């Protein structure tokens, strides 16, 4: 899936800004006035800004436009009525236009465009209802409406508030006869080139205009939702950043950046100035909503830094995810912002663990072989069954005749799939399942430099009376994970953070590391 983009020799003076659905729903005026206009003004940090928006959500993803559109697809496949949900979406966006767009002409056009897009959705769903089937292509077409409505609104709002902007629809950027069968290198290469063509008029324009791109980027092989998931808007923003050779990709959220732990659960959690791409990927996978891993693959290979920032605190520095090894201009650089070379270098040297996160709704399956198959056949059959029912394994521990696996089961559909898989797994041996568990993951690229971190983590849990159901640690030691009861997850976060990630712990580690370095110097000098 990754592709080898070659870094160019100069910056483009562009920044790509991606805004999530809840940010668009709750803070649209702040986005335009405090962020887009600030970065795009002649004396601003960047002269050129490209905006990418997710589908609008008023409060949560569950109540957002995309979730409602997917619900319509479910109803159409069951030949049920979906008209009421479409009307809720329409009224929500019309009310939004009436509330925020002051110019009558801009408001009227926005309302008209909104109605047209939703009429198209009705046509797609009515056709599917007649056929009794909703294809992945239809799901993509219906789902794209959410990003279109969001970007139409943000374009109108920008123009209404004196920031010239133009709506750019990417839903047909992939031609229907495109031959690629998967989201592979050829697809991403094609898409970046197509995006360059879309961006060309803005790059060459004498007048500064902000392009507002739909986060949905066309009908793709296997379907966008199946192939990428709900993080496709992040990926779209990343590909646009690569296409324009951006100075920076900014992902705007409702938090100040990446913390050492969830500050809602650990009040002492600290904001991190920088993390490595590997750390960000691990934190995302094991529970922290940082950024879609596919997104990082694209921009990091193009040597473009990613900055996580807060729409409610636009002047904050945020957290930067900086490319390893080679900078955009080609020089060697450590994985941190260039403006903080010395301080970040020593911070990286001294810190063992970077952050801790938890992931709830975990089930652990233990399978003991009936010894009717060889060990490699035993494992192969297990994963064949899990793949059939689309079950994902987060952690695994194996021996020749026993396998323990931690699986995320976040909803009723996943639970149904697990029960179906359980029946097949019992053919291979005895099966027992434990539910209401949580994965606790300690993440840090430099943990392997410190002896005893895993021991300290598990000892800390034991001292707090927290039972460990399962342990997993990779050879690269970037992630140490264990499974505990879900009811103990917050206590586990707090006690491990206090032991390994607090300011006091960092100061102590710095002192110990300084002593170790001095002893090593004396040893080399033969003293």
From Swiss-Prot:
Residues 442-527 form the ACT domain. Pathway: Amino-acid biosynthesis; L-methionine biosynthesis via de novo pathway; L-homoserine from L-aspartate: step 1/3; Amino-acid biosynthesis; L-threonine biosynthesis; L-threonine from L-aspartate: step 1/5. PROSITE patterns: ACT, ASPARTOKINASE. PANTHER family: ASPARTATE KINASE, ASPARTOKINASE. The lineage of its organism: Eukaryota, Fungi, Dikarya, Ascomycota, Saccharomycotina. The modification Phosphothreonine is found at residue 333. Coiled coil: none annotated. Its EC number is 2.7.2.4. InterPro entries: AceGlu_kinase-like_sf, ACT-like_dom_sf, ACT_Aspartokinase, ACT_dom, AK-Hom3, Asp/Glu/Uridylate_kinase, Asp_kinase, Aspartate_kinase_CS. It catalyses: L-aspartate + ATP = 4-phospho-L-aspartate + ADP. It comes from Saccharomyces cerevisiae (strain ATCC 204508 / S288c). Pfam families: AA_kinase, ACT_9. Disruption phenotype: Inviable on medium lacking methionine and threonine. Sensitive to amitrole (a compound that increases flux through the threonine biosynthetic pathway). Decreases survival time in an in vivo model of infection. Keywords: Amino-acid biosynthesis, ATP-binding, Kinase, Methionine biosynthesis, Nucleotide-binding, Phosphoprotein, Repeat, Threonine biosynthesis, Transferase. Phosphorylates aspartate, the first step in the biosynthesis of amino acids that derive from aspartate (the aspartate family of amino acids), including methioinine and threonine, the latter of which is a precursor to isoleucine. One of its GO terms (molecular function) is ATP binding. Homohexamer. Interacts with FPR1; the interaction is direct, plays a role in feedback inhibition of aspartokinase by threonine, and inhibited by tacrolimus and sirolimus. Present with 48100 molecules/cell in log phase SD medium. Allosterically inhibited by threonine. One of its GO terms (cellular component) is cytosol. It is an enzyme of class 2 (transferase). This is Aspartokinase. Belongs to the aspartokinase family. GO terms for biological process: 'de novo' L-methionine biosynthetic process; homoserine biosynthetic process; lysine biosynthetic process via diaminopimelate; methionine biosynthetic process; threonine biosynthetic process.
């Amino acid at each position: 899936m990754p592709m080898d983009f070659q870094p160019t020799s100069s910056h483009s003076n562009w920044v790509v800004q991606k805004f999530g659905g809840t940010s668009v729903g709750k803070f649209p005026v702040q986005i335009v006035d405090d962020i887009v206009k600030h970065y795009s003004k002649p004396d601003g940090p960047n002269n050129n800004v490209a905006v990418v928006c997710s589908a609008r959500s008023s409060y949560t993803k569950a109540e957002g436009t995309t979730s409602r559109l997917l619900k319509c697809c479910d109803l159409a496949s069951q030949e049920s009525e979906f008209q009421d949900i479409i009307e809720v979406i329409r009224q929500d966006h019309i009310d939004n236009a009436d509330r925020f767009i002051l110019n009558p002409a801009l408001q009227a056009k926005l309302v008209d465009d909104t109605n047209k897009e939703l009429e198209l959705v009705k046509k797609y769903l009515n056709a599917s209802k007649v056929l009794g089937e909703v294809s992945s292509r239809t799901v993509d077409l219906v789902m794209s409406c959410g990003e279109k409505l969001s970007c139409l609104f943000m374009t109108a709002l920008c123009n209404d508030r004196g920031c010239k902007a133009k709506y750019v629809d990417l839903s047909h950027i992939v031609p229907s006869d495109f031959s690629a069968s998967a989201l592979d290198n050829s697809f991403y290469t094609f898409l970046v080139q197509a995006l360059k063509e879309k961006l060309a008029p803005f790059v060459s324009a004498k007048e500064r205009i902000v392009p507002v791109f739909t986060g949905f980027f066309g009908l793709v092989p296997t379907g966008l939702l199946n192939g990428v998931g709900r993080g496709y808007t992040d990926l779209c923003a990343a590909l646009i950043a690569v296409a324009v050779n951006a100075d920076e990709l900014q992902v705007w959220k409702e938090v100040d950046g990446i913390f050492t732990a969830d500050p809602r659960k650990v009040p002492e959690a600290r904001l991190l100035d920088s993390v490595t791409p590997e750390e960000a990927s691990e934190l995302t996978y094991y529970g922290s909503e940082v950024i879609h891993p596919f997104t990082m693959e694209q921009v990091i290979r193009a040597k473009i830094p990613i900055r996580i920032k807060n729409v409610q605190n636009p002047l904050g520095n945020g957290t930067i995810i900086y490319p390893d090894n080679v900078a955009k201009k080609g020089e060697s650089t450590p994985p941190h912002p260039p403006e903080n070379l010395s301080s970040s270098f020593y911070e990286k040297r001294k810190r063992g663990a970077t952050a801790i996160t938890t992931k709830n709704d975990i089930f652990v399956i233990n399978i003991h072989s009936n010894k009717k198959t060889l060990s490699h056949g035993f494992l192969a059959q297990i994963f064949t069954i899990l793949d059939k029912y689309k079950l994902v394994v987060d952690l695994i521990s194996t021996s020749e005749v026993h396998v323990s696996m931690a699986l995320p089961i976040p909803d009723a559909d996943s639970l149904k799939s697990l029960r179906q898989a359980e029946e097949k797994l019992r053919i291979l041996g005895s099966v027992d399942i434990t539910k209401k568990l949580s994965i606790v993951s300690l993440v840090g690229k430099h943990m392997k430099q410190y002896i005893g971190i895993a021991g300290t983590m598990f000892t800390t849990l034991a001292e707090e009376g927290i039972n460990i159901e399962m342990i997993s640690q990779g050879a690269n030691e970037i992630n140490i994970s264990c499974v505990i009861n879900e009811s103990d997850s917050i206590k586990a976060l707090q006690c491990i953070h206090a032991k390994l990630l607090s300011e006091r712990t960092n100061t102590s580690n710095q002192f110990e590391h300084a002593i170790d370095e001095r002893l090593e110097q004396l040893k080399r000098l033969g003293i």
